[in-house]
Amino acid sequence: KIAELTGLPFASADDLFDATQNLDGFVTVSSSLKTCAVNLSKLCNDLRLLSSGPRTGFAEITLPPKQNGSSIMPGKINPVIPEVVSQVAFNIIGNDCTITMAAEAGQLELNAFEPVVFYNLFESIETLTSAVQTLTDNCILGITANEKHCEELVDASVGISTALCPT
């Protein structure tokens, strides 16, 4: 009936005993969400590093300003959106640990820890979805390259010597 009502391909588990005893399918989904969160946090770390500056740091890109910068560092833009997305990722990683431990905690024919699995799984799905949307709308779409500074870095790079001395 759920498949008919939603139009989604819901079906009973092939092995109902296994589905009652083990929550490995939920662990797999959670692990995939964790992997996505880890990669998203890594991307945010890269954005924070590449936008560090203005006088020191990489300063290769500029993030859209979303919060007042520092009073002691004029021109600094705080990378608040990448920071909040990384914090969401940390929470999803923690949720994955909770889901893993809950799946492991079942005994014999029953796992009584499904409520915490579902709570954390749904939270991870919802917060990851929101974090991606927030990062896209409030950061990614507004990033600008600091072309002049990047050109200066290329001109000063010792990597240019490779082009002058082909092997």
Residue ranges and their predicted role:
Residues D14, D18-N22, F26, N45, ...:
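Catalytic-core signal marking the mid-to-C-terminal active-site face
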Residues K1-L16:
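Glycine-rich, mobile lid/loop segments that gate access to catalytic sites or pores
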